[in-house]
Design a protein with these regions (language model features):
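Short helix/turn-capping signatures at newly exposed starts of structured segments
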Residues: 17-136, 155-166
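Short, exposed beta-strand-loop hairpins at the edges of beta-sheets
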Residues: 137-155
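Bacterial Sec-dependent N-terminal signal peptides
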Residues: 1-25
């Protein structure tokens, strides 16, 4: 019985470690533009996301009618881990896009080791640009994408992802 409890404890403890730590733990300052090109450090598609994260995501498929072609059906993939969610949109033609997300868990790591729990100072040190940190919310806006970083008590508390396309 003790052996089973020990094994379960180990599985829970090591259940969500990043697979590719060397690619993420760079800590050399990068520009906001470089960050927004590949915020996860890999292509933003379902296969890459599944292969490059080790969190035990629950995946749910949601069907949606294509607004331009109502006879066609697209699919939204919802990846859930605890209170965090990442959504991918897959068109009827097979194109995939990172649609949206909310990250509330430190085990979901973005490029340059940006993650929930990071101090404001360490967050600023990850970027070569001067960041306007006058408030507890910072938005990084790129071509068709917006990342909102929300701080509480000088620690990164939440990351919101909003991508838009037509």
């Amino acid at each position: 019985m003790k052996r089973i409890v020990y094994i379960v404890f180990l599985l829970l403890f090591f259940g969500c470690n990043p697979l590719n730590k060397t690619a993420r733990v760079n800590h050399k300052p990068i520009s906001k533009e470089v960050f927004l090109e590949q915020p996860f450090g890999f292509d933003e598609d379902i296969k890459s996301f599944s292969e490059n994260t080790s969190c035990k995501f629950r995946i749910q498929k949601l069907l949606r009618k294509n607004k331009h072609y109502p006879e066609k059906t697209d699919t939204i993939y919802q990846f859930k881990y605890r209170k965090s969610e990442i959504f991918f949109y897959k068109t009827h033609l097979g194109q995939e896009f990172l649609l949206a997300g909310k990250i509330l868990n430190k085990h979901i790591v973005l490029t340059n080791d940006v993650k929930v729990g990071l101090s404001k100072e360490n967050f600023q040190n990850r970027f070569s640009n001067q960041l306007n940190m006058a408030s507890d919310t910072l938005e990084m806006i790129g071509d068709g994408t917006k990342y909102t970083f929300i701080f509480e008590d000088d620690k990164l508390h939440r990351i919101n992802i909003d991508n838009y396309f037509d």
